[in-house]
UniProtKB/Swiss-Prot annotation:
GO terms for biological process: nitrogen fixation. This is FeMo cofactor biosynthesis protein NifB. It is an enzyme of class 4 (lyase). It holds the Pfam family Radical_SAM. Residues 37-162 form the Radical SAM core domain. One of its GO terms (molecular function) is 4 iron, 4 sulfur cluster binding. It comes from the Bacteria. [4Fe-4S] cluster binds at residues 51, 55, 58. Pathway: Cofactor biosynthesis; Fe-Mo cofactor biosynthesis. Keywords: 4Fe-4S, Iron, Iron-sulfur, Lyase, Metal-binding, Nitrogen fixation, Plasmid, S-adenosyl-L-methionine. Belongs to the radical SAM superfamily. NifB family. PANTHER family: FEMO COFACTOR BIOSYNTHESIS PROTEIN NIFB, FEMO COFACTOR BIOSYNTHESIS PROTEIN NIFB-RELATED. It comes from Rhizobium leguminosarum. S-adenosyl-L-methionine binds at residues 57, 105, 157.
Length: 162
């Protein structure tokens, strides 16, 4: 709405037209909205262990007690295991609204596992947001497929090669 005001169900608002369009896309996403993480849950599934670079961010640690973020995982999952885990969590956490693939390697480089996971989750929970985190090197090869899967949140990490 030109010159208008957009607001969320939890009281935040924006006034700029461009910001309003962006806000509409991120307001319910717990990774991108300061307030959304109080109302919506997200889950990362570690289905993509292969990577095309070795950076300091995704060091592919397992069971690191002090870290809980994309790139660090307790266990690698197959796409089928990830789907079962997502369905189990969704049955107990109704606020679950976002599923992301962010490693522990690169989600675009390990594409077959990432795509199979997204396809399974989207088939079972069609209204869930799908997200991906990638170093971007293999992203151009999969942009059309990501769009076809309605993956509308892509995080591109900017890291330094060791």
């Amino acid at each position: 709405m030109p010159g208008g005001r957009a607001s969320s169900s939890y009281g935040l608002s924006v006034t700029d037209d461009k910001d309003a369009r962006i806000w509409e896309r991120i307001k319910d996403h717990p990774c991108f909205s300061e307030q959304a993480h109080h109302y919506f849950a997200r889950m990362h599934v570690a289905v993509a262990p292969a990577c095309n670079i070795q950076c300091n961010y995704c060091n592919r640690k397992y069971d690191c007690t002090n870290e809980s973020r994309p790139g660090v995982a307790s266990v690698k999952l197959t796409p089928d295991q990830a789907l079962r885990k997502v369905l189990a969590v969704a049955s107990k956490v109704p606020e679950l609204s976002v599923i992301g693939v962010a490693g522990p390697g690169d989600a675009c480089y390990d594409w077959r596992k990432t795509a199979a996971t997204f396809e399974g989750v989207a088939r079972e929970i069609p209204d869930i947001k799908l997200c991906i985190s990638t170093n971007g090197l293999a992203l151009p090869d999969h942009v059309d497929e990501l769009a076809d899967m309605n993956v509308d949140h892509v995080t591109i990490t900017i890291n330094m090669v060791d």
